[in-house]
Amino acid sequence: MTKITRDVSITTENSKSTSGSATASSASLPENDHPIFHQPRARIRSGSLFIEGSDSFPSSEVKSYNVYIDDSKYSEILKGDTNSSSTDGKQVFEDARDDNFHQESHRDLEDSILDLVRRDPEVAAFPLPPPNSNERNRNSSNGSSAETNLNGHSSSGTISTSVLLNMGSAEKHAGTTRGDHMESSSMKSFEKLGTRPSSLFYPPPEGTAPYQGPRATVSGNKSTRQTQGTYSFPSMRYGVDLVSPVEGAVDVAKSRVPNSTLNGTFPDKAFIPHEFQIPKKAWNRIPANKSTSLKTPRNHSLLIDILKPFEAADLANDQRSSSAVLKNTVHSNGQYNPTNETSGTRMQDQRQKNTNEIDLEKIPNPQVPLGIAMDTMRSPNQLHEKEYESNIEAGLASGVGKGDNSIKQHQYKKIPQEIDRDQQLSFQMETMPIQRIDSSSIRSFDSRIYGFSEIYSIPRVITTLCICLFVPPLFFFFSINGNNGVSNYRLMRMIMNYEHRIGLLKGFEWDIDVQWFRTLCFVLGCIEMLAIFASIGIGFGVGIIRE
């Protein structure tokens, strides 16, 4: 009798297989927990292949449901399977299903098994199991054969619940899974009888013929799967056999999808990126007709018009006439001749070379008026420097223009050095960002040209001196520069005009000399001190005389 156990809290499903099919497993408990059956109940259905029972554990409220398979009925099914040669394994299993549950559809069988496992135990009389049932269960879980109990039931193997559920879940695997399951069950039954069926994993014993039954096709399918290295189980498939169903599904999906969409999605031609409409360089473009383009005549230089207006005018007229003649020839002939264009270009180049070889001494300098105007605004030293630079440039120009060797080698070495020195001086004097007041009356000694009042405020100077007369030490205080006296910045703000005073910024270097005011304050202070001491001496002398 095969026992099927379903535990609510703990379900042990050991799928240890040696033949490659779903094998029997038994639910075993630890050694410390001895199952005690209190009023076991069973329900026996007449003519049924399965017998259910219930076990209760007093230590906890956990209940165990057991389903037994009648070995006698199952042996009869197997005998009928071996005797009948016209029916296959699927038909035998359908007949057993009809005899057990009297149902007509395969779906009803699955629902009945689920209901059988999950229902509550009913009240029924069930005899107590023998005391060595726990040891027998442990032996059966370890793989040893168990003896038959008092009721004729044996727990030689426990079929996992998942096997029963998966056995009826997919009809497409009915031929393979049912055959494997029935073959695994038949192995246990034949072990009890002392005989062994022949299969791929169990070779026939000596002196016996191999098993030939109606399930030859099922065994053939199973052998092909085993040779491919797969594990035949309806819910778990490992090995190479897993690829074929996936590929088959992909092929079916592709057959359902129209071929037009697939062809449109994956074109056969190579991928061409977008070509952006960027203007390409002229030399990258290769014209279809490789003909030289018409070159326009070169424009004459404006410098030539300034230097020699008469020759420039003649040259411009010649260029206009040559271009007009060239245009007329092109329009009249209807085609372009490159020899005429090249000859005209050569003539223009020759004329320009001739005009460039004019003696530089005869050419007037167009920048002379501008240079004179700039020189008048600068100091005499700058005028001298400008004249020196112009002489150097004239010497270089004359030497290069004439093409003679009048200038010696040491002069060539000396002239660049002088030019570099002059450029450095001009950079230091003109380009330094120093805040200045560009005026001819910037210094105090420029008062002789009546520019003193443009910078300094005369009323403010007189007011400052009057205050110092009433307080004589202020003369000496203003005459000292530095931390002990008054800084140049504060002194300039005291005596300068309003227009210059608002532009003063602290921290900048001003080119204004206020030393004259400091000297004036020192002299006036000394005079005042002498006058004070003289008046004091005169007072003491007059008093002594009167006494």
Curated annotation (Swiss-Prot):
Glycosylated residue positions: N83, N139, N142, N221, N259, N263, N289, N299, N340
Record's signal peptide: none
Membrane topology: Multi-pass membrane protein
Transmembrane annotation, as ranges: 461-481, 522-542
Positions of region (Disordered): 1-38, 123-160, 194-232, 326-358
Keywords: Cell cycle, Cell membrane, Glycoprotein, Membrane, Phosphoprotein, Transmembrane, Transmembrane helix
Compositionally skewed regions (Basic and acidic residues) per UniProt: 348-358
Primary localisation category: membrane
Modified residues (Phosphoserine): S112, S189
Protein name stated in the entry: Bud site selection protein 9
Organism ancestry: Eukaryota, Fungi, Dikarya, Ascomycota, Saccharomycotina
Gene: BUD9
